[in-house]
Amino acid sequence: MHELTGKDKLAFNKLQKRLRRQVGNAIVDYGMIRDGDKVMVCLSGGKDSYTMLDILMNLQRNAPVAFELVAVNLDQKQPGFPEHVLPEYLERVGVPYHIVERDTYSVVKEKTPEGKTTCALCSRLRRGTLYGFAEEIGANKVALGHHREDMLETLFLNMFFGGSLKSMPPKLLSDDGKHIVIRPLAYCREADIAEYAEWREFPIIPCNLCGSQPNLQRQVVKEMLTEWEEKHPGRLETMFKAITNVAPSQLADRAMFDFEGLEDKQRDFLARRIETFDVLAREA
């Protein structure tokens, strides 16, 4: 990163403080990192994971708890992948790291029918490999670089195409119960992350496997949300607040709320009211 002066320096410092504050708040709000944790930071070479690692390294130096960071990149053997970029960067910033080599690219290309997107299979293979490696190195937390917009996009993808009301939680336990996944950038705006990555001059590596695929459902949803935000500034922030303020009794999921038991609750409520009136009457 070149030296900044004047207004540029002020703008960068303001942005950096905002991102650090948001990451710190997310970590505290959801108990993402505790004393003694070993956090495996999944580094893809994109703007989000670079920003996540950069901010976590700063927090590590200033946090009231001691935790370990180790950066891990999964080399999926995509054609043209610049294998030297991440090791050189990680050596320069001085963080412990591993490069895990798995030819998931060939598997994805072989198994995905022509014209279909590779995202789902690629994601499953990548997740399985990273979870396994986290266990191998003794990492009890796996940090992913998803941000606020990723979470909102996933919410609408599941609503529109999956028939379910769910998103990406800031913190979750994996299905096998072995790994806790955290998303420290949960409160961060994608635009802020992109600007920060540009200021910091991270050596961005584009994804040649999925990033260029046309008509991705996620891209359609992203464009929809972008248009909403342009027409109604602040709408995405309001929508994000909504997923942190869920009222199960106002939805229709019988597993989340006991609708059949409302009559019992009504009887109990009326009985308590009658009892209260009787007490007041006796006191009078």
UniProtKB/Swiss-Prot annotation:
Residues that hold [4Fe-4S] cluster according to the record: 119, 122, 210
Chief site of localization: cytoplasm
Cofactor binding note of this UniProt entry: Binds 1 [4Fe-4S] cluster per subunit. The cluster is chelated by three Cys residues, the fourth Fe has a free coordination site that may bind a sulfur atom transferred from the persulfide of IscS.
A biological process term (GO) from this entry: tRNA thio-modification
One Pfam short name: ATP_bind_3
GO MF, one example: magnesium ion binding
Motif (PP-loop motif): 44-49
Extra remark: The thiolation reaction likely consists of two steps: a first activation step by ATP to form an adenylated intermediate of the target base of tRNA, and a second nucleophilic substitution step of the sulfur (S) atom supplied by the hydrosulfide attached to the Fe-S cluster.
Family (UniProt): Belongs to the TtcA family.
Record protein name field: tRNA-cytidine(32) 2-sulfurtransferase
Organism: Chromohalobacter salexigens (strain ATCC BAA-138 / DSM 3043 / CIP 106854 / NCIMB 13768 / 1H11)
Record lineage: Bacteria, Pseudomonadati, Pseudomonadota, Gammaproteobacteria, Oceanospirillales
